[in-house]
């Protein structure tokens, strides 16, 4: 196989929006254990990169720029938005939040998987632009368990917990939009299921083609509808 054919296979893969890396979107109501599971997954799988959002809000105590968020000004955020640099963005309580499209595409093109901790509205925006993005919804084993977890965190007043539980009901209604659902009854089992989802996604035809385009073309295998 010539170098030009190899380059052509890889170029066609990228042109078709199929990257060597995968994009995972993890959605869950507050208290379902999303962040704990995501952090554990990231520590076990060095090939996954966590997307860090841009925000115009001020850093909270202990937060570091580039680790928790990319903290920026309203002017800079609006300029980036005008340049279509964000995959999805929203205004929350007077502050802007956005997910960098440029960074995500760069990571996926070099073969890294990218994970987004995101709400269901953001996931809908992402899915419209990345049809191969994989949605994973984390569910609690019951509403009673969710309430108990929120209380044990000790972070919120009772009225805030009540609001979170009400919000959880509307959020959970969007679980059907995800490709996978993980019920977080026990941490170990839920983490194992997340790892299985990642492994299965990496074996999808489009993922394998993007990672091994040279081999697929040599064997006469092409992307569906490819010319």
UniProtKB/Swiss-Prot annotation:
Name the keywords, alphabetized: ATP-binding, Cytoplasm, Kinase, Nucleotide-binding, Transferase
Q: Where in the cell is it found?
A: Cytoplasm
| Residues the entry annotates as binding ATP | 28-35
Q: Which major enzyme category is it?
A: transferase
Specify whether Mitochondrion is a keyword of the entry.
no
**Catalytic activity of the protein:** GMP + ATP = GDP + ADP
Query: Which domain of life does this protein belong to?
Result: Bacteria
In alphabetical order, the GO MF annotations are: ATP binding; guanylate kinase activity
Q: What is its EC number?
A: 2.7.4.8
Q: Which CDD domains match?
A: GMPK
The record, for InterPro entries, names:
GK/Ca_channel_bsu, Guanylate_kin-like_dom, Guanylate_kinase, Guanylate_kinase_CS, P-loop_NTPase
Single GO cellular component term: cytosol
* Gene3D superfamilies in UniProt: Guanylate Kinase phosphate binding domain, P-loop containing nucleotide triphosphate hydrolases
Guanylate kinase-like domain residues are 21-199
Keyword check for Glycoprotein: no
What NCBIfam families does the entry give?
A: guanyl_kin
Function field: Essential for recycling GMP and indirectly, cGMP.
Tell me the protein family, please: Belongs to the guanylate kinase family.
What name appears for this protein in its UniProt entry? Guanylate kinase
User: What is the gene name?
Assistant: gmk
